[in-house]
């Protein structure tokens, strides 16, 4: 049995839709079966798929805890710095409305109640995420990520279309549309634009017109790698926001092929106790 409170202020929402939003990694059939059996109670009343919830409602879910309270996948921890592996599709934290019963942070809080995220990944992107259970370590890590100094991030991706050069550095500017939650690459400075730099290296061919690439975001802007590679003419497979939707349909079921695979703490990093350490997480076999 799992007790849950709907965040205050949430507008009336269909119960099944809310459950999927709050627990995005739980298979849909788990909720469908529970609602059919009336194993979900809203404010004490047995409820089904036709019911709604709103801010402040109390939910009681009679569902196996393995679906609702999974453990975090931990790559390294000394109970001060935590290096977790976030699965694709799992948000790092609750959304703007406070919805998020299953996030990377809630998983970490079961073992480290005071843990804080040092940086973020998009929900669709998987791989390494740093968190801290120690205030001093968190401040050091926050400084490193804020100043883009002291940590080197390496991503693995699958990119479409043949490359003219096996490696290179891309420079441009990024404009953010906060209302739409999207960004746009431009090639000259403009009001509100921030400079971006991305390094790429082609590694091997995964299929005709599809290449495994290593990416390094020298700057760390929202959606930088996805938007920059699409602007470069090599969108990432599975990216329906910035990429090639027609090409993506040739690989049904494939998620965004972007994975934070390695993180190196440099010798001059503010993370003084972890200088020289390197963390690696193998990318999935997408195709």
Residue ranges and their predicted role:
Residues 1-180:
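RNA pseudouridine synthases
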Residues 163, 206-208:
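Catalytic strand-loop-helix junctions within cyclic-nucleotide turnover domains
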Residues 130, 213-215:
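Short beta-strand motif preference
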Residues 160, 203, 216, 266-268:
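A generic structural motif
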Residues 1-33, 190-191, 208-210, 218, ...:
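Pseudouridine synthases involved in rRNA/tRNA modification
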